[in-house]
Amino acid sequence: FYNKRRQELNSGIKPNKAHNILVELEKSLEINIITQNIDNLHEISGSSSIIHMHGELNKVRCIMDESHIFEWYENLDETHKCPHCGAQMRPHVCFYGEMPYQMDEIHNLAMECSLFVSIGTSGGTYPAAGFVSLFKEMKKPTVELNLEPSLNQSQFDFAIHKPATVAVEEFKNLILTN
């Protein structure tokens, strides 16, 4: 499954306009992207501060030492071993039931930032779906940019419900003029 997804990603899938607008915003504002997506479209578009809380398709890691993470663009099978310890390698992707990656770093960023913007999510996947509650508790403004209202839409202070490419551009225009 992950080999097929990796091949699809590396066959020329491109970032969309929303990815590119985030890069544009990054020139004027401090932006930290926390993504549940396992593609690298934010990196391809040029964003610089990205946390992949569910991992990345183009990386693998050792099953014995999670700090042994490697770039990987080929098919992965049981013959591929960790060059440090010889253990089996696996996709660097958060499997169902596993704790997402870098949660401490995400929490630290939440404490420092002044605005939370959620883009293109159903609001049903935890712990990410709970981020808006964390920001509400800290009395920080929250924005939802989504095709339709998310499951936790009532917790957002402001929303634009349109395709991400349209919603992100409208948000950019609002934020840069205020």
Per-segment meaning from a language model:
Residues 1-178:
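Conserved catalytic alpha/beta core of Sir2/sirtuin-type deacylases, generalized to analogous enzyme cores
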